[in-house]
């Protein structure tokens, strides 16, 4: 991939896939010294645009073809935009030759994806239970709800949805699907209401729909597998920044960054170091950076965002 300078940014109106980027200036600050940046989750191109404005060479990738089209409309020729999953970035020869000194991941689902009922991420009435990031990603949410064993359903609602009645909800889904296959959002909403009671509402639906989405897309496993590869692609002294929105995602990022920063890889109870290990770098953010109250007021979906960064050893 040839080296090219940042070109003028397009000034046209917003695209249909309009999305408000979270922690925009905080990301720009963490990556301010980077000259070659890989945006691993392009979305509508908001972060990439801000980084390109600062003079960086930006390559933006996304697994979602709708996001790729939106990012291209936003960025024009100011950045290179490709359809590629960040989990596959380490195996891509063009990205390896780029040798980025900055990498950004903004995890989760963007507002346009949530708001597009046809994508199946929403609990709006009649929305299809799809939730896949791309059409060839594997089983839909409906297929997973109809086929997964009760134990798998319960584990997903407990681990990804922090649901105390996860097993009861799993049993209710199994009971209902025996006579009526899950197909649209109403089917899952009604099962949730049957278990959580009449006081259940949008916050519960959002939390449990998110759990299904995470399970269907294998998001936590994908993140855990991708991080070591991205560190390998990152040039020495470079910064890897990750924005997470779910406690499970944040735990993975926090744990991995801490492990990378350890000088010794021996078991904790081993009294003498025998590995002669060397830390892979340092954690830049001792605590996660969170949105300001003003940002949350302007964009409520930013409320759960957590930003962490790691600098690779020189």
Residue ranges and their predicted role:
Residues 1-314:
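S-adenosyl-L-methionine-dependent methyltransferase catalytic core, i.e., the SAM/SAH-binding region
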């Amino acid at each position: 991939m040839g080296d090219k300078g940042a070109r003028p940014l397009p000034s046209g109106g917003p695209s249909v896939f309009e999305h408000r980027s979270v922690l925009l200036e905080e990301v720009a600050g963490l990556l301010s010294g980077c000259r070659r940046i890989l945006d691993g989750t392009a979305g509508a191109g908001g972060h990439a645009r801000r980084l390109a404005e600062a003079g960086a060479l930006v390559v933006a990738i996304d697994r979602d073809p709708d996001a790729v089209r939106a990012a291209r409309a936003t960025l024009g020729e100011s950045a290179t935009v490709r359809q590629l999953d960040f989990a596959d970035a380490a195996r891509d020869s063009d990205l390896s030759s780029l040798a980025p000194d900055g990498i950004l991941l903004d995890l989760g689902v963007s507002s346009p994806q949530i708001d597009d009922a046809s994508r199946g991420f929403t609990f709006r009435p009649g929305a299809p239970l799809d939730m896949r990031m791309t059409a060839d990603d594997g089983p839909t949410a409906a297929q997973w709800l109809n086929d997964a064993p009760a134990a798998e359903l319960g584990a997903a609602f407990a681990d990804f949805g922090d649901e105390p009645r996860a097993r009861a909800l799993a049993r209710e889904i199994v009971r209902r699907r025996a006579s009526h296959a899950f197909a649209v959002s109403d089917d899952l909403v009604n099962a949730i209401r049957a278990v959580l009671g009449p006081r259940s509402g949008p916050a519960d639906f959002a939390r449990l729909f998110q759990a299904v989405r995470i399970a269907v897309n294998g998001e936590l496993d994908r993140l855990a597998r991708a991080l070591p590869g991205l560190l390998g692609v990152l040039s020495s002294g470079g910064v890897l920044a990750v924005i997470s929105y779910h406690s499970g995602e944040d735990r993975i990022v926090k744990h991995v960054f801490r492990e990378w920063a350890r000088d010794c890889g021996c078991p904790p109870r081993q009294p003498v170091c025998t590995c002669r290990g060397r830390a892979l770098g340092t954690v830049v953010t001792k605590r996660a950076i969170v949105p300001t109250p003003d940002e949350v007021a302007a964009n409520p979906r930013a409320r759960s965002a957590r930003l962490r960064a790691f600098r690779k050893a020189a």
